[in-house]
């Protein structure tokens, strides 16, 4: 068993499913690190990654600087805990074009990855567009969303410590092939999410692809959406993926109580056990 441990700064969450601090990297002493590792060992759980998903290319320069500074703290914590992995976003200047954002990526990200290399940590970027509703309009908050953009990012930053946290669900609502990129980018896949999404064609037909995505799709537990998990896991085995796979729960139907949240994990685990040992 494993867990992707969230490491947001302490304080009020700025968005849904963010702001959680399983590990306070600001106060991570050697003693606290030893306690965390001992706690995990007692329960038979490994840390797959330390997670912090900010916008490191935020148009607000003060927020950008704070996000980058905290990301570096998460990298240091990953080294201290012997995890060697950080999962995150590259971010995006929401009101700028893809081309402008690639130039911003060229400026911001090589130093971050160089820092990670110095501390023997890999950085895995999730392919979530962070484009859901009016708060993310017009371009979303993460550039790293499609195979075409991945290629261009890897041309700019070919470091072996820079790779992908692959989530098939984000391709579902973009109506893209979520299997083929696994083969093309097999050497860049460092971490994997198991999350599903349900696309509602009748809603899409009414509002169109230019609408806010949450108007025509909904995150679901694995097996309750449109991902073919047999095909997905088959592709992962084809490419020889042997890294961590983490269930990510964002299904609103399983909110409201601690028991419902636990049910979401139990059901996801039970469903995926037919594919994963």
Name the predicted role of every residue range.
Residues 1-2, 7-11, 41, 82-84, ...:
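Histidine-acidic metal/acid-base catalytic patches
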Residues 3, 20, 25-28, 45, ...:
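Extended aliphatic helical segments
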Residues 4-35, 96:
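Glycine-rich, proline-tolerant flexible connector loops at the mouths of alpha/beta enzymes
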Residues 9, 22-24, 53-58, 92-95, ...:
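Short histidine/acidic/glycine/proline-rich micro-motifs that form metal-
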Residues 9-14, 30, 48-52, 86-89, ...:
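Short amphipathic alpha-helical segments, especially helix-boundary/capping motifs
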Residues 24, 29, 94-97, 196-200, ...:
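Serine/threonine-rich low-complexity intrinsically disordered regions
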Residues 26, 54-55, 79, 220, ...:
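Flexible, active-site-adjacent loop/turn segments at secondary-structure boundaries
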Residues 33-49, 55-163, 173-174, 184, ...:
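Active-site acidic/histidine proton-transfer and metal-coordination neighborhood
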């Amino acid at each position: 068993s494993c867990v992707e441990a969230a490491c947001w700064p302490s304080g009020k969450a700025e968005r849904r499913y963010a702001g959680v601090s399983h590990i306070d990297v600001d106060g991570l002493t050697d003693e606290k690190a030893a306690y965390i590792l001992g706690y995990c060992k007692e329960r038979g759980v490994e840390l797959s990654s330390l997670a912090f998903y900010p916008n490191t290319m935020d148009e607000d320069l003060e927020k950008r600087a704070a996000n980058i500074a905290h990301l570096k703290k998460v990298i240091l914590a990953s080294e201290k805990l012997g995890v060697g992995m950080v999962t995150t976003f590259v971010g995006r200047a929401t009101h700028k074009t893809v081309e402008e954002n690639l130039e911003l990526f060229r400026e911001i990200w090589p130093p971050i990855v160089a820092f990670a290399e110095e501390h023997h940590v890999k950085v895995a970027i999730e392919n979530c567009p962070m484009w859901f509703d009016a708060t993310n309009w017009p371009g979303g908050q993460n550039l790293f969303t499609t195979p075409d953009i991945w290629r261009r990012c890897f041309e700019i930053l070919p470091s072996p410590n820079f790779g992908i946290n692959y989530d098939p669900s984000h391709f579902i609502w973009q109506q893209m092939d979520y299997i083929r990129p696994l083969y093309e980018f097999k050497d860049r896949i460092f971490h994997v999410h198991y999350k599903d999404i349900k696309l509602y064609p009748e809603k899409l037909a009414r509002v169109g692809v230019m609408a806010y995505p949450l108007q025509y799709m909904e995150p679901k537990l694995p097996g309750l959406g449109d991902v073919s998990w047999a095909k997905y896991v088959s592709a992962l085995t084809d490419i020889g993926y042997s890294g961590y796979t983490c269930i990510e729960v964002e299904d609103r139907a399983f909110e409201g109580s601690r028991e419902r949240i636990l049910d979401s994990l139990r059901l996801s685990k039970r469903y995926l056990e037919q594919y994963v040992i």
